[in-house]
From Swiss-Prot:
Enzyme Commission numbers on file: 3.1.4.11
Name of the gene: Plcz1
Protein source organism: Rattus norvegicus
Cofactor list: Ca(2+)
UniProt KW keywords: Calcium, Cytoplasm, Developmental protein, Fertilization, Hydrolase, Lipid degradation, Lipid metabolism, Nucleus, Transducer
The name this protein goes by in its record: 1-phosphatidylinositol 4,5-bisphosphate phosphodiesterase zeta-1
Domain PI-PLC Y-box: 385-501
Domain PI-PLC X-box: 162-306
């Protein structure tokens, strides 16, 4: 005899599907639509396969009972039912107190109370009779487990929760390189979509390569190559439209300026007329000699370019006509590599001794600190454009000692990846001392003609704020970039850990001290849910690789066993443990691949996020394609537990 619950469930189910069966039977296409109506979107390829298995007469049409079997196969997943049954006495209904027990003991929702559990029941339980009794059926439980509330990424981290009132140099800033390119750097097209896409992804520092164009119209392209050209004004109009769609926080326009003074003035007119009051053109009264905070610069556009004179001189010229005035600027290119020519990493004590010697020395003896191998390049800078540069004056990096003595608070230095890599290994303490005071931008080496990227993690480890990547090139570096800047609400600004802001702590990513607070992380890989369908995934072995990126000692990965020929619901039930020394800098990446013995592995999907942004308990890991497309409902089902020592 059917129970009260079973009758209620049957009535609810038939009320949802009966209109679709008025003609008797339904096709695979209607089956797919009906599943979506029941709040369970599916990949059509999976539906087709299960439909075929239940089409007993091979007519391409199924009955209500056949559909019920398909529905249960997709919704009443074995691993979900197992968890549900653990907290129910009759394996039919989850009482409210049992739901609270599950949420606190398994999901670590420690603030869960009666009102919160009722809210979950009201939101996810579809059967009215069960909902009214403040209980949950497997239908409601499955809907809750597949909801956004059970995603791996903490909802807290999905909001701007960090202190946004620190100076700009205290933040990692999402930055792009050659933003105008959507392919390689030699023949590839320049496209306005490069800027739109980067801004929508939360990028806050865009690169604009500016050159003289015909009819006094500055253009944007990769100079001395066959890449196509964009009008500067078109780029600026697009930025104006999309700058603050994803984030309210400031956008920095990094101008690679090759224009004549006349066309620099045209650029100035375009910037002022397009951005209006959004364009920062004067120092903020509260920040005359220090960098403002992201909060103070909300909805502002900052110009990063060469600048002549001081900020006080710029303020004195406010409102004056600067048209036709261009000044010569000598850019000194230093090739002194004394600081990065050593073979042994410098210790914290050695660095402190060297800084002390500098402070005690006669300033006149420091005048030659960057004289070796000096070259001079003369530039002509339009005063009008120069005066738009306030807190982001562009300077080439010379060396750390020069910066300590001469660099001004509003100067942003840039260095190529090769030099930055060498310094991060040999002069990590000094590098962190530098980035704690000044914004530092690291860009890909010029030999990356294919627009490939470097691993940004090694430069985040020493506090570099603007680690500029080719956003148009998918792969591991961009996965790390996207994962890093998921944090803090995807605002494009992530507060650096205190040990990268406080130079007295003596942090060295290459030799992290034992007085930190490591994390012991345990992940039970339970199953895959409707993994992406292609020919290999249905015929090949599927593996999951869990990778950790952070300081060098935290780089590690572990791999699951292979599951054969099952992309719909592979089961692993494997447990992996990681000891992470510096969790504040660590990212974790889940990779799903098909294992090909002849053709090599093929990526099915991946997901990357900061370790400290992971929820505990039973969680769903969404998957994204190589290009960054969301592959919902494809996901991994895992159990997460970790503690800090």
């Amino acid at each position: 005899m059917e129970s009260h619950y079973e009758l209620a469930e049957a009535r609810w189910f038939m009320s949802k599907i009966q209109d679709y069966f008025r003609g008797g039977k339904i096709s695979a296409g209607i089956t797919h639509k009906l599943l979506e109506k029941l709040d369970f979107p599916c990949h059509f390829a999976h539906v087709k396969r299960i439909f075929k298995e239940n089409d007993r007469h091979n007519q391409g049409r199924i009955t209500t009972e056949d559909f019920r079997t398909i529905y249960r196969c997709i919704v009443h997943r074995e691993e979900i039912v197992e968890i549900f049954n653990t907290y129910t006495e009759n394996r039919k209904i989850l009482p409210e107190d049992s739901l609270i027990e599950f949420l606190t003991q398994e999901q670590y929702e420690m603030e869960m109370d009666e009102s919160s559990s009722v809210e979950i029941i009201q939101k996810y339980e579809p059967i009215a009779e069960v909902k009214n009794e403040r209980q949950m059926s497997i239908e409601g439980f499955a809907r809750y487990m597949f909801s956004s509330e059970c995603l791996l990424f903490k909802e807290t981290c999905n909001t701007v929760y960090q202190d946004m009132n620190k100076p700009l140099n205290d933040y990692y800033i999402s930055s792009s390189h050659n933003t105008y390119l959507i392919s390689d750097q030699i023949l590839g097209p320049s496209d306005i979509w490069g800027y739109i896409s980067a801004l929508v992804k939360g990028c806050r520092c865009l690169e604009i390569d500016c050159w003289d164009g015909a009819q006094n119209e500055p253009i944007v392209y990769h100079g001395y190559t066959l890449t196509s050209k964009l009008l500067f004004k078109t780029v600026i109009q697009a930025i104006n439209k999309y700058a603050f769609v994803t984030s309210d926080y400031p956008v920095v326009l990094s101008l690679e300026n090759h224009c004549s003074p006349g066309q620099q003035e045209v650029m100035t007119d375009i910037l002022q007329s397009t951005f209006g009051d959004f364009l920062l053109s004067d120092i903020l009264d509260e920040f005359p000699d220090s960098l403002p905070s992201p909060e103070a610069l909300k909805f502002k556009i900052l110009v990063k370019n060469k600048k002549v004179g001081t900020l006080s001189e710029t303020r004195e010229r406010l409102g004056t006509d600067k048209r036709g005035i261009a000044l010569d600027l000598e850019e000194e290119i230093y090739e002194n590599e004394d600081e990065d020519s050593g073979k042994e990493p410098e210790t914290w004590d050695d660095f402190l001794s060297r800084v002390k010697e500098e402070q005690e020395a006669d300033p006149s003896t420091l005048s030659g600190i960057a004289d070796a191998k000096k070259k001079i390049r003369k530039l002509r800078v339009a005063l009008a454009l120069s005066d738009l540069v306030i807190y982001t004056k562009a300077e080439k990096f010379r060396n750390f000692q020069y910066s300590r003595v001469y660099q001004q608070f509003n100067e942003t230095t840039s260095m190529g990846e090769s030099r930055a890599r060498k310094l991060s290994k040999l002069r990590a303490h000094e590098f962190i001392f530098h980035t704690a005071a000044f914004i530092t931008r690291v860009y890909p080496k010029f030999t990356r003609a294919d627009s490939s990227n470097f691993n940004p993690q090694e430069f985040w480890n020493v506090g570099c704020q603007m680690v500029a990547l080719n956003f148009q090139t998918p792969g591991l570096p961009m996965d790390l970039q996207n994962g890093k800047f998921l944090d803090n609400g995807g605002s494009g600004y992530v507060l650096k850990p205190d040990f990268l802001r406080d130079t007295t702590l003596g942090f060295n990513p290459n030799e992290p001290e034992g007085d930190g607070h490591p994390v012991t992380l345990t992940i039970r890989l339970i199953s895959g849910i409707q993994l992406p369908v292609n020919v290999p995934s249905n015929t090949s072995d599927i593996i999951v690789i869990i990778e950790v990126y952070g300081v060098p000692n935290d780089h590690m990965k572990q791999q699951s066993r292979a599951v054969k020929n099952n992309a719909f619901s592979p089961r692993w039930n494997e447990t992996f443990t990681f000891l992470i020394q510096v969790p504040e800098l660590a990212l974790i990446r889940f990779v799903v691949e098909t294992q090909g013995f002849l053709s090599g592995n093929e990526l099915l999907g991946q997901y990357t996020l900061p370790v400290l942004c992971m929820n505990k308990g039973y969680r769903r890991v969404p998957l994204f394609s190589k290009s960054g497309a969301n592959l919902e409902p494809s996901s991994l089902f895992i159990y997460v537990w970790y503690y800090r020592e």
